[in-house]
Regions:
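Short, glycine/proline-biased beta-turn/loop segments that scaffold the active-site neighborhood
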Residues: 1-13, 118-126
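Penicillin-recognizing serine hydrolase domain
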Residues: 20-26, 41-126
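Conserved catalytic neighborhood of penicillin-recognizing serine enzymes
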Residues: 4-40
Length: 126
């Protein structure tokens, strides 16, 4: 995923080391799927474990009626070796605009440093 230009506008090279901040910046500033996947898997260990953590986070934000299939929001089949087994290849995350707003509000209120990242006008990903 991280080296496929279809999914990652900030390619990650196998064998290279990246800081968490580099991955977070590329994830939050330019929506780099490879960085998102790397962070989620490093934190949770698997797509299924990440989904459980994301559902718990959403619940804290007051959101309970959503479906999370992966950390990126792509169809399940696009995740290659990280796709969920036994789940349709076309399954995608399902949440409303209100759900996204509630999760975003919770994120900013509880992790205000998020704004320091998202207010950057540019970042170097070399």
């Amino acid at each position: 995923m991280a080296d496929d230009w279809h999914f990652s506008n900030v390619p990650l090279m196998n064998g290279e080391e990246y800081t968490v901040r580099q991955l977070v910046d590329s994830m939050m500033l330019v929506s780099a799927d490879g960085s998102t996947e790397a962070l989620a898997l490093a934190d949770a260990g698997s797509t299924a474990a990440f989904n459980k953590k994301m559902m718990a986070f959403a619940k804290k934000a007051g959101v309970t009626d959503i479906k999370i299939y992966n950390m990126i929001g792509l169809p399940n089949g696009d995740l290659g070796k990280h796709k969920l087994k036994g789940v349709d290849k076309d399954a995608e995350n399902l949440l409303s605009a209100k759900d996204v707003a509630l999760i975003s509000k919770y994120l900013v209120e509880n992790y205000p440093e998020t704004l320091d990242i998202t207010k950057q006008k540019f970042a170097n990903f070399d």
